[in-house]
Structures are given as structure tokens and as C-alpha cells.
Amino acid sequence: MDPEMVALGRKLFYDVRLSSDGRVSCGGCHSSYTAFAHVDHPRSHGVLDREGRRNAPALMNLAWQSEFMWDGAIKHLDLQSLAPLTHRTEMNMSIDSILLFLKNDPGYQRAFGKREISIPNMLKAVAQFEMTFISRGSRYDSMKRKQVVFTDQEHRGYQLFQKNCGICHSEPLFSKPGTFASNGLLMDSLLHDKGRAEISGKPEDEFLFKVPSLRNVEATYPYMHDGRMKTLTEVVKYYSDRTLLLPKALGGGQHIIVLNSKERVDVVAFLMTLTDPRFLQNPSFQEPR
């Protein structure tokens, strides 16, 4: 990656001037301290305090992802940031207004340097910055490198996780890139969000959402695509007596999860080992001063 492009992308990521009301940036909904998730509201808020339908997802290890957004609407990271920039609810800008601003701003004239000030170069710079969001320094990673040994509780939780959760949240990413699944949540009648089907147009994709990574999940509350669950304990309890219908990508059929109260505590203990403190506190991810 080009360090100058990464620096430009970082500047763009945190610039509120790229929103129509001058108050919203990418970093406003994606905080580096929470693995680039949005913890202030169940669903993201954009310009003029407009409320979206979904929770802003965490951003990490994006180089290994093949689709972006909860519904997989974007297929390439270089294009992803264009969606929030131009969405009416989020940043509400037009391509022309963005380009005019960048070309007339002395700071961006310097930041682009010899590169053409263009939308493709802007998008590529943001993507280059986001590609640096690599999380690999958790207690789980140290265990895998044989640098630490799990406690008995963490080990029990790990075994339970592998048996019950790993089919969707597979190691080492703790997600399943390119896979969309239903976890059985009832649709919020006010949001009327049909998930993947809104992109594919296929009835069988109704209420399917991208399987998110669970790395740093301790920090990425609230949970689910619409932020309806506040704690990991609540999430694990929801899944603890559940029969899930697996999508074809995961082999189809049913997946039955049964966890008692003690086992739920063990699973949460394991999930806490996925927290990467260095990632959450990395100064190179934070807003430039």
C-alpha cells in the first residue's frame, strides 16, 4: 500500500466537510476505539440527525472480505465509501459536489500531490486506509501462537463456540466472507428491512444479512444488523435455544443450538478473548491532528 494514499484516505475518512450539513464523517459512525463500529445509537445517524435502518458495522480485516454492507450491495472495497457519501440519510453529497470541494481545497490539493484529484483516486485512498485495519493481536491469537494458555473457562467456551457458532463465524476471521444468513430475528415492522433480498430481488434472500466478524465483538455493541441487542450476554442467550435454517452456502438444513446458563457464561468468556487492545488503541487509526 502507498503510505501517501493511506494518509490521504485517513484525512478523507475523518472529514465532516464531505457531508451536506458539515457534521458527519465516516469516522463519526465508525469509531476506531470500538473497532470502527457505532455504539452511540442502535442505528446510525446521518446528516440532519436522520436515522438509518441499520447499525454501522465494525471495520476490520477488510482485505479478506468479498462483499460489503449488511446486504452485500457493494462488491469491491474501492467502491464502498461512495454509498454512504451519496446516501440521503448518511452524508447526502453528490459526486459533483465532492469533486468540486476537493479540487478547491488547498489541503486536498497538497494531499493529492501529483495524483489527479478525482473520485476514483479519492475512493481508492479511503480503501487503502481501511485496508490497514488489521486485527490480529487478541488473546485468542496469542493462544493460537502458543504464547498464552486459555483459562479452563475460556477453553470450555472455545469448544462450545466451535460446536455451536463456528459454522457461521469460522476461524480465523470469525465470519464467513460472502455468506448471508438468517438468525431468526423477526423483522422490525417500522424498518421493513428485507436484507439481501433488497439487492438480489430473490424471495429466498429475504431477511438474510451478511455474517459479521466477531473479532473485537466485546467493543462493537449494540448487536445485530439493527442494533436491537445491547450486550453479549443477551445475544448468547438469544442463540442458546435456537434452531437456525442454514443457507445453501453453509450446506442448508437445520442447525440446532442448545446452551445452558453456565455454558452461556463460558461462551461469553471466550468471546472476550477476541478483543485486540492494540487494534482498538492504534493511534494511526485515529483522527489526524
Feature map (PLM): residue ranges:
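Periplasmic c-type cytochrome electron-transfer domains
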Residues: 1-289
